[in-house]
Amino acid sequence: MTKTFRKDTERCQKRGYNMELLKTAIRLLEAQGSLPPSYRPHKLSGNYDSSWECHIKGDWLLIWEQNDSELTLLFTGTGTHSDLFG
């Protein structure tokens, strides 16, 4: 987890988001390396072309980097589209 991700999770907690939903998505990624289609996971492009994004609920997003050959995940952001992309 990055420092930014930790700050993002604190902001989401203050907003009253159900953090169990985020934890569930993270656990699924850790266990399976992917998410079900209901999360709408997809690869990003441009400045974020090494990252993936999914929808936790509505406009609440999770962004992460994934290296399948090394079996690593790096959670880099969570929040709304405007929080994360300006």
Task: Give each language-model segment a name.
Residues 1-58, 67-74, 78-86:
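Basic, Lys/Arg-enriched alpha-helical interface segments
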Residues 63-64:
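Acidic, metal-associated active-site segment
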